[in-house]
Amino acid sequence: DFKTKYKRSVLGVLWSFLNPLLTMMVQYIVFSTLFKSDIPNFSVYLLTGIVCFSFFSEATTMSLTSIVGNASLITKVYVPKYIYPLTRVMSSTINFGLSLIPLLFVLIITRTPIRSAILLLPFGVGCLFALALGVGMLLAAAMVFFRDTQFLWGVVSMLWMYATPIFYPESIIPSNFMVIYKMNPLYHIIRFIRIILIDGISPEPKAYALALLVSFVPLLIGATVFKKTQDRFVLNI
């Protein structure tokens, strides 16, 4: 999937570096005058949110069609069906890993201290991977029985992006909405990663627990739904 994505592209895999940087530049210009005064190290804050959400969006969108898109293979060759969404998420993870390079570049350019806390990054990435896989498996199963899922997910993912503090500070959220706002799994995972990169410290123990909770509960739900419905995939694809 990763090789196919950049097939016949002039810049090829370089787009993994350029996409987050170009997106950050545009959003930085648009939002810096509005939010920069409230957000320390806005460029790192912004790019961290972009890179994390882009991975989640790409991984789940690719997973969505992982079963129906491989209908001919599934009906002819037996392969454990969870492999299909898993490989899509893993492909997006490679792209995500490459996009961390421009993030590191921005950290250096902005002279953000790179401390030992960065070694905790794999924990945050692992939680993000688990969340994407859980949602991806749920979407892949839903797509088999309800083809409008792809269009609904396009709307939901856009709303999810605006409900996640990617380019704005959480301080602008009214206090009476914060309880609902914090039900967003990406809020906790992105916050965890930002504390590591921007503050250079280990997050509080509660942040670890929340990151695990909001990532592995969706994974458990997605895997359970996928397992219970997979025997009917062949009849509906």
Model-derived regions, located:
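Hydrophobic transmembrane alpha-helices and immediately adjacent juxtamembrane helices
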Residues: D1-I237
